[in-house]
């Protein structure tokens, strides 16, 4: 796992992950309760951009009262 953040707020959860793909590249996933958005990334610069965007999303959620879940 290259990047992972889990957040919760009032019974809702959000998880942001970036991991190595099974055969090639990387997979970025955004879990929002039961909805999942997935992107395949084939360029390391896009991975870096996805990490930065996920960090910003996580910070915005925390500003709105979401708490990071650490396991």
Model-inferred region functions:
Residues 8, 29-33:
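A generic structural motif
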Residues 14, 48, 57-71:
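Short, mixed-charge low-complexity intrinsically disordered segments
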Residues 24-27, 45-54:
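Short, surface-exposed linear segments at secondary-structure transitions and domain or protein termini
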Residues 19, 31, 52:
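Surface loops and adjacent helix of pleckstrin homology
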Residues 1-25:
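Short N-terminal "domain-start" leader segments
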Residues 32-49:
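A short, exposed loop/beta-hairpin motif centered on an aromatic-Gly-Thr core
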């Amino acid at each position: 796992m290259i990047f992972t953040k889990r957040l919760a707020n009032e019974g809702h959860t959000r998880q942001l992950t970036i991991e190595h793909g099974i055969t090639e590249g990387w997979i970025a996933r955004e879990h929002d309760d039961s909805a999942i958005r997935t992107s395949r990334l084939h360029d390391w610069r896009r991975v870096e951009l996805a990490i930065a965007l996920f960090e910003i999303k996580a910070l915005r959620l925390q500003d709105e009262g979401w708490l990071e879940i650490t396991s």
